[in-house]
């Protein structure tokens, strides 16, 4: 499996720069807008959020959506696991990276994290945490895949596991899932999350 040690230096440098640029923007506005419905995109484009996460969009709609985001100076991420009509494999990753030109790919699968890294886009590994067993399995998956960013869901779990995750894997953390109120956003940020991801329009500044 790919790791930073055996990824070509040009890839590592380019993606490191993209990650640094993203988190410089998150330092100012620590919110990524999650788009489940196309009608929400204009509001996200008009907001100050530096990144937009696409989930559940049909594959044949993705190009114009991603390009509209990038035209506004924002970064576009696609959750490959949830995109209808797109292979959940290396070919699907290559299509998003090379044909669409996404800034990053979100996935729960370690193999797709490696594929995203190989294709020189930001790799975000989503961790769905429900119990202690799931936490330890997730930690092993992150250690194996070495993503650029970890997204922890649901947000209510993060304060309970934040110290363990940061101790084992010092990569930037985004928190999402059921972030619907300002106090939930602030709780995640206070526990060390660099940003939150949410589809709640009222939380997009």
Residue ranges, per PLM feature:
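Catalytic beta/alpha-barrel core
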Residues: 32-36, 50-59, 77-85, 99-110, ...
């Amino acid at each position: 499996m790919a790791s930073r040690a055996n990824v070509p230096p040009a890839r590592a440098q380019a993606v490191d720069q993209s990650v640094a640029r993203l988190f410089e923007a998150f330092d100012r506005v620590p919110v990524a807008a999650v788009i489940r419905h196309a009608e929400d995109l204009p509001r996200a484009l008009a907001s100050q959020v530096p990144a937009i996460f696409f989930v559940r969009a049909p594959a044949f709609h993705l190009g114009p959506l991603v390009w509209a985001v990038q035209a506004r100076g924002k970064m576009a991420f696609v959750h490959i696991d949830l995109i209808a009509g797109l292979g959940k494999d290396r070919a699907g990753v290559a299509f998003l990276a090379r044909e669409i030109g996404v800034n990053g790919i979100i996935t729960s699968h370690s193999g797709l994290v490696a594929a995203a890294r190989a294709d020189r886009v930001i790799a975000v590994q989503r961790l769905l945490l429900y119990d202690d067993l799931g936490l330890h399995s997730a930690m092993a998956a992150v250690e194996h895949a070495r993503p650029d960013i970890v997204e922890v869901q649901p947000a209510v779990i993060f304060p309970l596991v934040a110290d363990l995750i940061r101790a084992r894997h010092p990569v930037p953390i985004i928190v999402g899932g059921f972030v619907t109120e300002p106090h939930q956003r602030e709780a995640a940020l206070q526990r060390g999350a660099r940003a939150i991801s949410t589809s709640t329009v009222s939380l997009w500044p």
